[in-house]
C-alpha cells in the first residue's frame, strides 16, 4: 500500500536528505529547536518494510518528549532486495551524518521499535567495536534481538500473540534479512553479542508477544555486563503497542516513560 506524503503539523519542518543509497527525513521545530540532543529513529518492519507515516507521528512524539529535539528518521534499505548488512550500513551512515553536523555521540539518542530496536543495538555494538563514539542512550520498543526465534516466549506466547502467533509463515520465521549470514551474528541478532560499554537503555515490551524473551534476555545480559537498563513489561500488551499513540492507557504510559527516560539522560541521573 502506497501512503500519501505525510504533512507535518504547522510547527514543524520536515526536511528530506539524500544519502548515497537511501533517504532520510529530519523533523525539527520551526522556532527554537532544542539542539542539546538529537534522536535517531530506526523504524520497524522486520527489515523488509520501508518507513511508514506512523514513524513521522512517532517523530513528533519524540520531539515533544525531548523538549523540542530534532528527530532524524532514515528510510534504510530493506530485504529481500537489500539483505544484511544494508540496514546496518545505512544506520551507520545516518549516525555519521549526525556526527558530521557537530553532535557528539552522547548527544545522540537511538530509538527504534521491533527490527529498529534490534538495529539500534546492533549499531551501538558496531560503533563500540570500531572505536567510534557510542550514543547517549537507547529506547527500544519490542526490540527484535533474536532472529533465530529461539527464546522461551516464542513457544509460551505462540497462541497468545495476535500479530505473529499461531503460524510459522510470519516474517519472524520467514525472513530474508540475514541472507547467507549466520542468524546468531550479533550485528543481526544483538542478543548473542556483548553489551559492555553500552549507554543506558529503556526496553519496553508487551507480556503476550512472542518477542518477549528478546527483551527480557537482553536486559538480563546487559545488566550482568554493567549496563543501566530499565525493562518495562506491559501486561496484556501486544507487539509495538505504542502504535496506539496516546489512545490507550498502556501506550500513553509507555510514551510518558520514554519521556522520563530522556529527561534522566539529560540530567545524567541514575535510572
Q: What is the meaning of each model-derived region?
A:
Residues 1-2:
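N-terminal targeting or regulatory segments adjacent to alpha/beta-hydrolase or S9 domains
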Residues 6-271:
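Alpha/beta-hydrolase superfamily serine-hydrolase fold, recognizing
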Amino acid at each position: 500500500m502506497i501512503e500519501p506524503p505525510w504533512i507535518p503539523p504547522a510547527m514543524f519542518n520536515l526536511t528530506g536528505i539524500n544519502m548515497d543509497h537511501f533517504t532520510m527525513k529530519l523533523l525539527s521545530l520551526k522556532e527554537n529547536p532544542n539542539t542539546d540532543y538529537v534522536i535517531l529513529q530506526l523504524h520497524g518492519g522486520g527489515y523488509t518494510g520501508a518507513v511508514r507515516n506512523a514513524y513521522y507521528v512517532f517523530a513528533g512524539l519524540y520531539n515533544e518528549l525531548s523538549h523540542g529535539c530534532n528527530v532524524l528518521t532514515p528510510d534504510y534499505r530493506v530485504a529481500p532486495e537489500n539483505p544484511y548488512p544494508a540496514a546496518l550500513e545505512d544506520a551507520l551512515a545516518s549516525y555519521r551524518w549526525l556526527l558530521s553536523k557537530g553532535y557528539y555521540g552522547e548527544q545522540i539518542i537511538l530509538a527504534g521499535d521491533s527490527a529498529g530496536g534490534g538495529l539500534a543495538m546492533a549499531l551501538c555494538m558496531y560503533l563500540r567495536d570500531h572505536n567510534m563514539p557510542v550514543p547517549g542512550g537507547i529506547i527500544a520498543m519490542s526490540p527484535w534481538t533474536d532472529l533465530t526465534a529461539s527464546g522461551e516466549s516464542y513457544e509460551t506466547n505462540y497462541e497468545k500473540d495476535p500479530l505473529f502467533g499461531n503460524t510459522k509463515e510470519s516474517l519472524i520465521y520467514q525472513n530474508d534479512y540475514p541472507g547467507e549470514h549466520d542468524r546468531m551474528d550479533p550485528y543481526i541478532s544483538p542478543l548473542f553479542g556483548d553489551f559492555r560499554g553500552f549507554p543506558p537503555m529503556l526496553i519496553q515490551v508487551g507480556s503476550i508477544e512472542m518477542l518477549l524473551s528478546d527483551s527480557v534476555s537482553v536486559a538480563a545480559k546487559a545488566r550482568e555486563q554493567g549496563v543501566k537498563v530499565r525493562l518495562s513489561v506491559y501486561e496484556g500488551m501486544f507487539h509495538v503497542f505504542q502504535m496506539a499513540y496516546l489512545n490507550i492507557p498502556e501506550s500513553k504510559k509507555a510514551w510518558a516513560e520514554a519521556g522520563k527516560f530522556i529527561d534522566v539522560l539529560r540530567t545524567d541521573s541514575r535510572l
